[in-house]
């Protein structure tokens, strides 16, 4: 192109003449040179046109640049997946993950003794037999906020009402051993209680959880934890009453402490723990009551029940043990409860009272314990983290051609709600509390097709001695009311998904 332009300029310079100049004859040799130049310019122009045409054809035939791999685009645009999408901005310190839990139960609770009509002796026969219910319908979210803060919010919509599960705000700097928790959560009651209901070995937690009234409470706790090796926890908390209590007279409170130690000895992961709770009753309802269902909540009937006891509150001490040995696990806990009761004749102020609680001549004490063993036929191990049972990892998920995880569990669960607090001729207040004794023999089979899907079957036989229903179930016996024996069988199924 440059050469062509130069020749054109040279030609123009050579042949051009002022417009007003008179034409002069051109020598023959000059005319010949000009003609030769013109031919050369024409040839160069043809060559340039050919080169441009070739360049355009090559550009048109070249393949388009390959787009970025779809996986890379998805990775930059999609959230992480942990049972549900998790949105996270690590640089800013934000994260958000929706969560939920659905549990559907169906089962049968047997009728001890002859079937009677309606409610007799406090036992509602209409509420025994077959039943089904939505045990939990939980929706919520969890995540992180800048500066080491975190949150967890869960609402339970089962039974046509809104209940509150964990609703907490936490604070823990990265790698810090100190964690603060404020909100509505379980007050450090036991290994069973602190383990999520998504992950328990049986449909319901151990009997003392129900009997001793372990519910979430509004409070605050400070924990010392091991962020590196998960070797220990030590937590203390101060709590008020339940968050779903709409009254303004919530003067009851609780102080709790729990410690755990989880060393690994060879191939065995151990859990050793202890807990203590000091509970004070609401001042205008100074009473306590202890009762438990027969190992399932497909019925609301209880065969062990102390009724209301006039008391300032109670104190509870517990010991915890657990071990994971590859596909085996064992667990055991024991708790002792002491009631701080009021004696007959006790008087109260204008705004105090026992609200129907019975007075006893001494301070009753109750106790409960369980022991269980479990085994995964498919090679998994029970999960453990932070002083509680955690989610197992399914080795061969159903969606990848495997059979999922299959686990068998067996448990003995003992509860004693009877106590003679003073010498007397009767098996009633103020000398004796006939709350009854319950011994459960339980089996459960759990199938996890994937990490977040669970199907569970359970059988339980409850053996009872005494209690408030013994006279109705075993009428006409020559045995004292507190020694009359009967049994109740129950079977239940659960379908569960969580995210």
Describe the residue ranges of each PLM region.
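Outer membrane beta-barrel
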Residues: 83-282, 365-400, 405-422
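N-terminal periplasmic/intermembrane-space "pro-region" immediately following the signal or transit peptide
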Residues: 20-103, 109-117, 377, 381-396, ...
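Residue-level detection of beta-strand scaffold positions
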Residues: 34-35, 55-56, 94-96, 170-173, ...
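Gram-negative bacterial Sec-dependent N-terminal signal peptides
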Residues: 1-20
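Outer-membrane beta-barrel pore domains
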Residues: 25, 125-126, 288-499
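Secondary-structure boundary/capping motif
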Residues: 34-35, 41-49, 154, 168, ...
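Short solvent-exposed loop/turn micro-motifs enriched in small/polar/acidic residues
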Residues: 80, 162, 213-215, 312-314, ...
């Amino acid at each position: 192109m440059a050469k062509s332009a130069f020749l054109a300029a040279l030609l123009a310079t050579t042949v051009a003449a002022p417009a007003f100049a008179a034409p002069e004859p051109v020598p023959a040799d000059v005319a010949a040179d000009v003609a030769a130049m013109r031919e050369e310019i024409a040839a160069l122009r043809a060559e340039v046109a050919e080169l441009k045409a070739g360049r355009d054809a090559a550009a048109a035939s070249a393949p388009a640049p390959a787009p970025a791999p779809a996986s890379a685009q998805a990775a930059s645009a999609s959230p992480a997946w942990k049972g549900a999408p998790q949105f996270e901005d690590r640089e800013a310190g934000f994260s958000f993950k929706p969560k939920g839990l659905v549990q559907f139960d169906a089962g049968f609770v047997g009728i001890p003794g002859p079937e009677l009509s309606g409610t007799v002796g406090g036992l509602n026969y209409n509420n025994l037999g077959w039943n089904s219910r939505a045990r939990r319908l939980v929706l919520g979210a969890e995540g992180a906020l800048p500066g080491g803060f975190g949150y967890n919010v869960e609402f339970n919509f089962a039974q046509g009402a809104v209940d509150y599960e964990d609703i907490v705000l936490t604070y823990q700097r990265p790698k810090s051993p100190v964690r603060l928790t404020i909100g509505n959560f379980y007050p450090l009651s036991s290994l069973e209680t602190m383990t999520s209901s998504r992950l328990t070995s049986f449909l319901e937690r151990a009997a003392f959880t129900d009997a001793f009234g372990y519910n979430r409470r509004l409070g605050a706790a400070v924990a010392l934890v091991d962020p590196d090796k998960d070797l220990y926890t030590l937590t203390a908390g101060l709590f008020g009453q339940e968050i779903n209590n709409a009254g303004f007279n919530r003067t009851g409170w609780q102080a709790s402490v729990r410690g755990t130690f989880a060393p690994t000895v060879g191939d065995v992961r151990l859990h050793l723990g202890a807990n203590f709770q000091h509970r004070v009753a609401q001042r205008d309802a100074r009473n306590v009551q202890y009762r438990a269902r027969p190992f399932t909540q497909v019925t609301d009937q209880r065969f062990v029940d102390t009724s209301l006891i006039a008391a300032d509150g109670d104190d509870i001490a517990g010991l915890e043990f657990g071990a994971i040995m590859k596909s085996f696990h064992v667990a055991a806990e024991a708790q002792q409860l002491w009631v701080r009761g009021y004696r007959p004749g006790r008087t109260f102020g204008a705004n105090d009272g026992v609200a129907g609680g019975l007075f006893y001549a001494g301070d009753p004490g109750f106790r409960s314990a369980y022991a269980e063993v479990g085994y995964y036929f498919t090679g998994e191990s029970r999960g453990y983290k932070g002083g509680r049972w955690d989610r197992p990892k399914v080795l061969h998920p159903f969606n990848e051609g495997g059979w999922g995880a299959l686990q068998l569990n067996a448990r003995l669960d003992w509860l004693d709600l009877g106590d003679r607090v003073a010498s007397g001729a009767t098996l009633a207040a103020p000398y004796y509390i006939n709350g009854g004794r319950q011994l459960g023999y339980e089996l459960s089979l759990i199938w996890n097709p994937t990490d977040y899907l669970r199907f569970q079957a359970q059988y339980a036989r409850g053996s009872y001695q005494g209690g408030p229903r013994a006279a109705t179930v075993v009428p006409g016996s020559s045995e004292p009311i507190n020694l009359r024996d009967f049994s109740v069988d129950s079977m239940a199924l659960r379908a569960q998904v969580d995210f």
